[in-house]
C-alpha cells in the first residue's frame, strides 16, 4: 500500500521527518527522489537480516551513476568502529536502514543542520547512542550524481565545517587535518573503484 502526501514543508529533512511520522512499518528505508534499488531482492535481504540478527541499524554500499546510468562513483562502506566519524567516515545515508522506534527514542533529523543533517543523525545513532549495526556488503541503491549534497565544492565544504562542529573537533587542527585527509583518500578511492565496475547501465534494475 502506497500513501502519497503532498504539503508544504521546511526543506528536505522536514519532509523526511513527516514521512517517518506517517510510516506504519517497523523499519524505515528512505529512498530519495531519482534514486532506485540496485537489485529487486535487496529489501528481502535487509529484512531477513533484521529478523535473524536483530540489529538496530543495517547499511550497505551506494553506487552513484551519471545521466546515462553508468557507474561514476562507488561508495563501498565498511563495518562501523567507534570514532570512525572523526576520520571523515559515515555510512552512505541512502543505504541507512533502522527501526522506526529509534527515531522515537533518539530523535529524527534536525533541519537546522542543512545538508549535514543525515550524517548528524547517523553519528547520533551510532557514535553517541551506540546502536548495534551490521554492514551488509551489497549495493543497496543507485543514486544520480549531482544531487543537492554534491552540488559544488563550496556546498561540500560548508557541510564538512558543520560536521566538524557537530563532532566537536573544529578547534583541533590535528583532528581537522586527519578528518579531511581520510575523507579525501576515501573519495578518490570511490571514483577509482567505479572505474573497475562493469560499464553496463544500471537503469534496468528495480526502480
Annotated model-derived regions:
Residues 164-207:
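Membrane-interface aromatic/basic loop that binds lipid-linked glycans or pyrophosphate carriers
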Amino acid at each position: 500500500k502506497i500513501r502519497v502526501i503532498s504539503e508544504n514543508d521546511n526543506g528536505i529533512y522536514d519532509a523526511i521527518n513527516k514521512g517517518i511520522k506517517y510510516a506504519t512499518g517497523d523499519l524505515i528505508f528512505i529512498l530519495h527522489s531519482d534514486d532506485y534499488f540496485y537489485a529487486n531482492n535487496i529489501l528481502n535481504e535487509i529484512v531477513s537480516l533484521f529478523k535473524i540478527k536483530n540489529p538496530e541499524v543495517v547499511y550497505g554500499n551506494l553506487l552513484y551513476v551519471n545521466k546515462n546510468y553508468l557507474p561514476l562513483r562507488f561508495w563501498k562502506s565498511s563495518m562501523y568502529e567507534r570514532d570512525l566519524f572523526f576520520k571523515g567516515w559515515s555510512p552512505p545515508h541512502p543505504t541507512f536502514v533502522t527501526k522506526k522506534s529509534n527515531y522515537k527514542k533518539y530523535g529524527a533529523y534536525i533541519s537546522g543542520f542543512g545538508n549535514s543533517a543525515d550524517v548528524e543523525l547517523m553519528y547520533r545513532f551510532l557514535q553517541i547512542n551506540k546502536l548495534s549495526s551490521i554492514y551488509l556488503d551489497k549495493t543497496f541503491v543507485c543514486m544520480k550524481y549531482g544531487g543537492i549534497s554534491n552540488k559544488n565544492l563550496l556546498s561540500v565544504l560548508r557541510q564538512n565545517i558543520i560536521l566538524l562542529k557537530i563532532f566537536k573537533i573544529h578547534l583541533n587542527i590535528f583532528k581537522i587535518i586527519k578528518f579531511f585527509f581520510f575523507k579525501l583518500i576515501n573519495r578518490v578511492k570511490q571514483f577509482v573503484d567505479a572505474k573497475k565496475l562493469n560499464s553496463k547501465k544500471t537503469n534496468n534494475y528495480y526502480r
